[in-house]
Amino acid sequence: MISWLQISYGAVLSGLVAGGAVAVLARSQRLRSAVPAGVATAAGALAWNAILRAAHGDHFFTDAPLVVLPASWQDTGSGVFALASAALVLGLGVLPAAPARRVVGYAAVCALAAFLVDVYLY
């Protein structure tokens, strides 16, 4: 079972990577977008992994038999929860007047960051 230390490490790392990626993309609203995007990504990854831990979801951690992309359902769930939390935080809180395409794009970057961090870094 995944430990709280691993969950915390993965959430923080996902948030840092997502925040950095959004900072690169959001030129005019760099700090205003990047920090909340990183926090939302970390919160999403933390929430998903806490749910798996509480539900004893050991089978979600089985990696696909692909050398290039050994993803599991746990990795995918982190990306999905990061997408949802980032879309809500950015769309409803930080960038309410921004075009939906931009908000969803930033949220997708957060989801991809969380997914890739889960697959390759822990």
What do these predicted regions represent?
Residues M1-V39, A45-Y122:
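Juxtamembrane/disordered regions of integral membrane proteins
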